[in-house]
């Protein structure tokens, strides 16, 4: 089934291996839907979750939506070709509504099952584009998703601190300016942390590495 947005193309021989979460950064879902469906805007996403929790399919999942932009993950550019994009209606300055998170959990579970994507494949827009993007932002509840097996979160049983650069590379972060990389990592896992890189950053990053 095709969605209403014309902004999509072929997946260039790839299949979805990632799910990228965004906030719309716009006043409401109606405004976001209009932009994501405007051929002149040249942006789109596969799904838009409205304020009331309605999941709106804008682009079929087997098509390449234009949501990620410049960036990379796990050393590979062209994230659009190998990802599914989910936009959540939120201006970026407030918590996400419970009904939106309920819908997101349900939607993620179905997409992950459909495309055989593990929790490590659910990432933030800010993860793959450090310094360029900040969504879904510091108010997004990643820990809630992790409790349902829908994302990764630091283990309570943390081992020794390991070099942060090495850990972030192994997790998937792009090799960009270290300060931007640290900011992107903290935005997701320590959103209210400030200051220079610390042992706590290193311990958390080490706990996220695949066993």
Predicted feature locations:
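Active-site-adjacent loop/helix surface patches within enzyme catalytic domains
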Residues: 1-120
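Basic/polar, cationic surfaces and motifs that engage anionic cell-wall
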Residues: 77, 92, 96-211
